[in-house]
Amino acid sequence: MIGPPWLAHVASEEAILCVERIAWREGKLDHEPIPMDYSVIPGCTYCNPQVAAVGFTERALKEKGLKKGTDYEVGKFPFSALGKAIASAHTEGFVKIIRGLPRGEVLGAHIMGDQATELIAELSLARRLEACTRRRWRPRAASSTRKCVRL
């Protein structure tokens, strides 16, 4: 075992990476494999309500010596303010995003509520791509669907 996080999909990726590195060292792969970035792997708890997270917590950033307001900021949004949550009667929960300053890259994200384990995927990808939250992300799934229906 390599170590945490002890998740089946992580173990599968580690095994594939191991085989790729062996193949690369033997000259059977034309590029060096990209190392795993464990900070972009979401953790999901399939309970009710669901809980999901990716990246750093505020505590971890403070332990690294980063300061809230100077190095990062935190935004939190309740499910109770989302139209979809109201329509589906699943208003319990929130989304919390920790973004770096000054760029606005996603340092961490935490979701508690209905479909949290699905919603975390977009924030995991944003973290992986170092997407800047200061820009509006387009297209969003809902706007894409709406535009397709108009065609």
Regions found by a protein language model. Give the residues of each.
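Short, flexible active-site loops
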Residues: 1-4, 38-46
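Anionic group-transfer/hydrolysis microenvironments
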Residues: 2, 15-16, 98
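Flavin (primarily FAD) binding-site architecture
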Residues: 2-5, 21, 122-123
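Active-site metal-coordination segments of metallo-dependent hydrolases
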Residues: 5-9, 55-56
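Generic hydrophobic secondary-structure packing signal
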Residues: 7, 11-14, 118, 122
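Internal hydrophobic alpha-helix adjacent to the cofactor/substrate pocket in enzyme cavities
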Residues: 9-37, 66-71, 130
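Flexible, glycine-rich terminal cap/loop adjacent to redox cofactors
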Residues: 26, 41, 46-151
